[in-house]
Amino acid sequence: MGVQFSAAELTDLVGGELSGDPGRLVVGARPPEEAEGGDLTFALDLHARKLIETTRAGVAITPVRWPFEHLTQIVVANPRLAMAQVLAHMFPQPIAMPPAGIHPSAVVHPSAVVHPSASVAALVYVGPRAAVGANTHLFPGVYVGAEAVVGSECLIYPNVVLMDGIRLGDRVVIHAGSVLGSDGYGFVPTGERHLKVPQVGTVVIGDDVEVGANVAVDRATMGQTEIQAGTKIDNLVHIGHNDRIGRHCLIVSQVGLAGSVKVGDRTVIAGQAGVANQTTVGADCLVLARSGVTKDLPDHSKVSGFPAQDHLLELKQQAARSRLPQIVEQMRQMQRRIEQLEVQLLGRL
């Protein structure tokens, strides 16, 4: 049996209000519909009431106290925050880490500097004059190019490519298959062909950034492509050359940012949205899913649609578009009635 946690211990951890048996023990955490008696489960909002009513979990973290006597409840103001705190406490290391040191099959250039506490797993390549910081884990198949710098306490998952000269801060997480520092998309038409523009810049990633799986972050044409501290990027996102992403932004899956885009702090860009070349999105903005941003947005904007515009205006236009068939039919009826009236009027002259 794994480590057991009491309801009282978890209540103290999240600062909640306990309703039920403080000695109730849990050893795992599962969604309400999958949970068993030894599991903790979560109701992230009031819509989860029916799931909690029928769950077989022993303990549930809930936003309010519900009259369900079959389980112990820990009532908190922010269940999602409590879930993050509890899961980190119950599962401090959910993925097995490679041991410290350099695996015999890894290739580390003699001029590279790898901290003794770092782990360099099987088939990793670390290039000339590259640096890997303390307690950083490079999983199998990672490529670290020449003069690239990886900070301390980073997690670089399998088959990540960190091209020459890019710089990662501390506590950066890069998930499997992502490529940082590939060439930006730069070509000059010359009539019969497209001449490649050399991409001689770099990529700089701030502290506490997390990059999902299969993300591409292009190096700058000149200067740097930058993702600042605390920003979280979902899977399958493209960050173009010379983009500058602010602090603590959220960029959701399948977003595409063209070159030289600037995004302000704490902005959220939802799934499949696109931002046009050389566009600035201000701070604290919300770009809703599948939006197409074609012009600069001021701070605190909330936009949707293509081209992206104020969300309320977009909703009104969508509502109006849904009524177009009815409006067209009404116009046709009015036109026929006008024609009839014209005939009647002419007949009286």
From Swiss-Prot:
Entry keyword annotation includes Coiled coil: no
GO biological process entries: lipid A biosynthetic process
InterPro entries xref list: Hexapep, LpxD, Trimer_LpxA-like_sf, UDP_GlcNAc_AcTrfase_non-rep
Record bears the keyword Transmembrane: no
Active-site residue list: H241
Catalysis: reaction(s): a UDP-3-O-[(3R)-3-hydroxyacyl]-alpha-D-glucosamine + a (3R)-hydroxyacyl-[ACP] = a UDP-2-N,3-O-bis[(3R)-3-hydroxyacyl]-alpha-D-glucosamine + holo-[ACP] + H(+)
One MF term in the entry's GO annotations: N-acyltransferase activity
Keywords, sorted A to Z: Acyltransferase, Lipid A biosynthesis, Lipid biosynthesis, Lipid metabolism, Repeat, Transferase
Domain of life of the native organism: Bacteria
Annotated GO CC locations: carboxysome; membrane
E.C. number: 2.3.1.191
Pathway it works in: Bacterial outer membrane biogenesis; LPS lipid A biosynthesis
Similarity comment text for this entry: Belongs to the transferase hexapeptide repeat family. LpxD subfamily.
Function statement: Catalyzes the N-acylation of UDP-3-O-acylglucosamine using 3-hydroxyacyl-ACP as the acyl donor. Is involved in the biosynthesis of lipid A, a phosphorylated glycolipid that anchors the lipopolysaccharide to the outer membrane of the cell.
Record-linked HAMAP family: LpxD
Record's subunit section: Homotrimer.
Protein name: UDP-3-O-acylglucosamine N-acyltransferase 1
